[in-house]
Amino acid sequence: RVMFADPTLEPSENRAIFVDPVNLAVLGDMTVYGTSGILPLRQTIDYLHTSLMLGDIGRLYSELAASWMWVAALGGIALWFYTRPKRRINNRFQNRRRVHVVLGWILLGGMLLFSATGLTWSQWAGGNVDKLRAEMNWLTPQVNTTLSGQHEVMDEHAEHRSHHGGMVMPEMAMDLTQFDGVLSAARNAGIDASRLEIRLAKTRDRAWTVTEIDRSWPTQVDAVAVDPHTMQVLDRTRFEDFPLMAKLTRWGVDFHMGILFGLANQLLLVAFGLALCVLIIWGYRMWWMRRPAQSAVSPVQTLCQSWLALSVWGRGVTVLISVLLGLALPVMGVSLALFVLLDWLRWRAATRVTLAESSAK
């Protein structure tokens, strides 16, 4: 499979030519997606997952889920900790609750992992995550294509960004025989993965890059910069030298995408998704069974009412944490503001009803 950048395709899409390695016959020509070159079926699944096939507007849905999933997971654990009975009680509700709690503990690590890795390539929070990683020196190093200068950084989420993930095709004329020389130089320098990406220089004063793109375990993402005229290796990066957080990001993203451990990884993702659906439905069922039967006996309980019941210090801390999270995770901030507005309107309406009933008495 040989993939080429094509400016007529959508972002992150490439044209793939399938060639028989024995007789060099062309067996196929189709559009693939991302650095790994996934085929149309998985591409459709990916678009459904990231944006519901609605483009940038649809990406708000997945970012909303990633922004709140870790809150729901940790909030559920906190709720269980403060409301768990001191002694084991065997009744229908407690048995249902026990199933929900056990399943929640089992899925907790996955919910935190997928929330964190999903946010790293999200449309709005992703930029803030990148700034944090840059400040903490957690970015992935990239080979320098000039004879002097600083190392650049690599984007682990190139497949989900708004640019092409394949080779850059410069406008200047090129000698196709240079591919063999550059590849040979890279092989001699230790680039031995079966899946490679060769990026041509955009300008004459830049080197070509050869990058391993095998994200399955063990990860092979070493890269070299090669002078296409002298075939000398100018710079290289090795995965074993990456900062720990850069390695964890690489592994986390690849696990999230079902690449790291192949079929086993994908089956685990399917099982996690189904179990998460069961957890959510089970939680709503418990809430439905315990919902107030009569509004007169159980008056409206709103977030505003609970917030007012806190101490002044508690209110201040709650507001501060909410503002900081809203700035770091913009989609969470906007959705929280809308929720608080609706809750406030509901609280005001309930307050008016209570005052009216008191006046009537």
What are these regions (language model features)?
Residues 1-3:
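Hydrophobic alpha-helical bundles that form the membrane domains of multi-pass transporters
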Residues 7-48, 190-197, 207-257, 261, ...:
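Extended, hydrophilic extramembrane loops/domains of integral membrane proteins
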Residues 34, 38, 54, 109, ...:
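Solvent-exposed, acidic/flexible segments
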Residues 129-246:
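Membrane-proximal low-complexity regions enriched in glycine and acidic/polar residues
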Residues 261-272:
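Membrane-interface anchor segments at the N-terminal boundary of transmembrane helices
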Residues 355-361:
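Short, intrinsically disordered terminal tails adjacent to the first/last structured region
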